[in-house]
Amino acid sequence: MTTLSTKQKQFLKGLAHHLNPVVMLGGNGLTEGVLAEIENALNHHELIKVKVAGADRETKQLIINAIVRETKAAQVQTIGHILVLYRPSEEAKIQLPRK
């Protein structure tokens, strides 16, 4: 799991601002297929948005915690139903500022 400093999180939030959600969770919740899609998107993009729809606060937080745990990605930000995740790939596309 990647730990990010406040400076790095602010940098990633700025990059993520213009992104659209790549993965959207529906009524079925967090399935193996959704996790595989998130993994694929993280490998390809490093920084993604995931939309967690139609859940109450506690359920949404449990889903977010499960996604972060399973993907070993860093949770950059959560606003409403949108989760921003970051995980560096082998060939880093995003150069983070120093801690």
UniProtKB/Swiss-Prot annotation:
Sequence ranges assigned to domain CRM in this UniProt record: 2-98
Keyword entries, A-Z: RNA-binding
SUPFAM superfamilies: YhbY-like
Gene Ontology MF term list: RNA binding
Record-linked Pfam families: CRS1_YhbY (PF01985)
PROSITE patterns named among the record's database cross-references: CRM (PS51295)
Superkingdom to which the source organism belongs: Bacteria
NCBIfam families, sorted: RNA_bind_YhbY (TIGR00253)
PANTHER family reported in the protein's UniProt record: RNA-BINDING PROTEIN YHBY
Name listed for the protein in its UniProt record: RNA-binding protein HI_1333
Species per Swiss-Prot/TrEMBL record: Haemophilus influenzae (strain ATCC 51907 / DSM 11121 / KW20 / Rd)
